[in-house]
Amino acid sequence: MKKTDELRTIRIDPLVTPAELAQRHVITPSIMDTVISTRKNIANIMTGLDPRLLVIIGPCSVHDPVAAVEYAGRLQVLRKKYESRLEIVMRTYFEKPRTVIGWKGLISDPDLNGSFHVNNGLSIARKLLLDINKLGVPAATEFLDMVIGQFIADLISWGAIGARTTESQIHREMASALSCPVGFKNGTDGNIRIAVDAIRAASVEHLFLAPNKYGQMTINYTSGNPFGHVIMRGGKSPNYHAKDIAIAIKYLHEFTLSEYLMIDFSHGNCLKQHRRQLDVGESIAKQIRDGSTAIFGVMIESFLEEGSQKVIDNKSLVYGKSITDPCLGWNDSAFLLEKLANAVDSRF
């Protein structure tokens, strides 16, 4: 029999449904409280009702659940220590957008070898989010795939739409449905307007097609997300300086949007040199001390060990070191959190 469709599909595997996975790894009442209260705290911070600083910090991507839980345990201590000045949320990214090719994240390829055991990856990711939240550490992630959010979104306190997808209509529609506050990164070329446009688009009602928790394709009608915001991540040059922030605030003001934003210390702002996150942090701390109220949050790439490593066949990985973008090590991360907490004192 002749075919005109699926001519380039070489394999189709059955996928666990979000409902089945949620029954296997159940959210508890205490974790629900953590997620709900953190989302509310973030909303209050980004609208100026809470003078604290939101800090999204953690590895570029999660590849080792054991190391991630250890990191979360250390982070919980600092979250408690600085709770009056910082709202610390752990970066737990399971999906990786690639400019061309490369490892696409723990959910897609949990074994790091191209075997693509997605069902196992989804299970590992959901269990890990439960373990992290159980420690009292809320979780943040990037929403990249249009379906994967159904499996983990109930455990996420803050979400991001990345620089490569901020301009995408379907991602803006997805953001309009998400229950958590969502940050939109400026484009890889530094274009801030597309992030502002994304906030506007995601704030209103949409309809889109997607599977529900039971795998049935459905028409989703959304109410819009009132807590979209810009993430300044740099582009061809950094954009964390006061003059760059003023330009972004002008764009937000033009459309009567909330005049608060987040600064990504990594990516274009550190010129892809991970230790320069410390320099960005110094600048942001000074801007806060000098009275800037526009900066409501920051993002830091950090792990147990400094730097990054490549995945090489038959070679053991260094525990607690990133396999994607290089990160700050733990000591530098703790130093940076202390610096930010001290700067936020000026807001009280």
From Swiss-Prot:
Give each disulfide bond as a residue pair: none
Gene Ontology CC entries for this record: cytoplasm
What Pfam families does its record include? Answer: DAHP_synth_1 (PF00793)
Q: Which GO terms describe its molecular function?
A: 3-deoxy-7-phosphoheptulonate synthase activity
Q: Where does the source fall among the domains of life?
A: Bacteria
GO terms (BP aspect): amino acid biosynthetic process; aromatic amino acid family biosynthetic process; chorismate biosynthetic process
Alphabetically list the UniProt keywords: Amino-acid biosynthesis, Aromatic amino acid biosynthesis, Transferase
Look up keyword Acetylation and say if it applies.
no
Q: Does the keyword Transferase apply?
A: yes
| Catalysed reactions, as listed in the record | D-erythrose 4-phosphate + phosphoenolpyruvate + H2O = 7-phospho-2-dehydro-3-deoxy-D-arabino-heptonate + phosphate
The pathway is: Metabolic intermediate biosynthesis; chorismate biosynthesis; chorismate from D-erythrose 4-phosphate and phosphoenolpyruvate: step 1/7
EC nos:
2.5.1.54
Q: Which InterPro entries match?
A: Aldolase_TIM (IPR013785), DAHP1/KDSA (IPR006218), DAHP_synth_1 (IPR006219)
* Xref: NCBIfam families: aroFGH (TIGR00034), PRK12755.1 (NF009395), PRK12756.1 (NF009396)
General function of this protein: Stereospecific condensation of phosphoenolpyruvate (PEP) and D-erythrose-4-phosphate (E4P) giving rise to 3-deoxy-D-arabino-heptulosonate-7-phosphate (DAHP).
Similarity annotation: Belongs to the class-I DAHP synthase family.
The name this protein carries in UniProt is: Phospho-2-dehydro-3-deoxyheptonate aldolase, Trp-sensitive
